[in-house]
């Protein structure tokens, strides 16, 4: 379809050429498809055709991988009386590379005593921007996250006591995704002083004393 994103750089291209009922029929020798300036005919390698009502259906598979980016298709044909059909053009975009995604903060494995946390980072896709960014916290969706024109993003979250799992996912226009999972621990438990041990028992004012404190 026009303007479609595809991830296959040898994407088969399907098209139909038909003549009106009662017409002279499609002249197969005139059917041509042009992909980015290179013209292919019904006898070209990669072209397959089959008859349908009043015409033909064609499937052309590029034999050389197309580059990532935008591509233009142009189709021409005539009937057996020499009447040329109106040229049809379409475009599509190939994107074989998932979006980039980096997390600036927090650091992986962070342990904090503050429940308020801001996740920041950057994402980009050279071929099929804009990026759709989503985030989950402990399996619960936090919805979409706004991405600035430079690819940066920022999202405030509230941590639960204990280990928290944060998953950030970037999705490009072709549907390819990149995800990063962060583990952040919230520890607000106050340490408890359980006991003090002096060893050995002091027997004189000049004795050396070792003090051990047990905290949990």
At which residue positions do the language-model features occur?
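Short strand-edge motifs at loop-to-beta-strand transitions and within beta-strands
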Residues: 54-60, 151-155
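Aromatic/hydrophobic beta-strand junction motif of beta-rich domains
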Residues: 13-19, 119-123, 211-215
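Extracellular acidic loop/turn motifs
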Residues: 19-28, 124-133, 216
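Short, solvent-exposed loop/linker segments at the N-terminal edge
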Residues: 3-9, 108-115, 201-207
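Surface-exposed, short loops/turns at beta-strand junctions within beta-sandwich domains
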Residues: 62-70, 156-163
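Flexible, low-complexity linkers/stalks enriched in Thr/Pro that connect modular domains
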Residues: 89-102, 182-191
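Proline-centered linker/hinge motifs at extracellular inter-domain junctions
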Residues: 1, 26, 98-99, 106, ...
């Amino acid at each position: 379809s026009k303007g479609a994103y595809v991830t296959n750089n040898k994407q088969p291209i399907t098209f139909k050429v038909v003549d009106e009922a009662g017409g002279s029929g499609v002249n197969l020798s005139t059917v041509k498809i042009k992909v980015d300036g290179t013209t292919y005919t019904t006898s070209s390698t990669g072209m397959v055709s089959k008859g349908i009502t009043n015409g033909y259906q064609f499937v052309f598979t590029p034999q050389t991988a197309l580059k990532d980016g935008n591509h233009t298709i142009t189709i021409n044909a005539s009937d057996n009386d020499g009447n040329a059909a109106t040229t049809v053009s379409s475009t599509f975009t190939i994107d074989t590379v998932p979006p980039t995604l980096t997390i600036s903060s927090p650091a992986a494995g962070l342990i904090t005593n503050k429940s308020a946390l801001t996740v920041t980072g950057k994402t980009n896709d050279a071929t099929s921007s804009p990026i759709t960014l989503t985030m989950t916290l402990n399996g619960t969706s936090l919805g979409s996250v706004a991405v600035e024109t430079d690819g940066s993003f920022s999202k405030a979250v509230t941590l639960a006591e204990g280990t928290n799992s944060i998953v950030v996912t970037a999705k490009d226009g072709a549907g390819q995704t990149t995800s990063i999972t962060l583990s952040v621990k919230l520890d607000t438990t106050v340490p408890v002083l359980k006991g003090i041990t002096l060893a050995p028992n002091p027997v004189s004012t000049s004795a050396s004393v070792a003090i051990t404190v047990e905290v949990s």
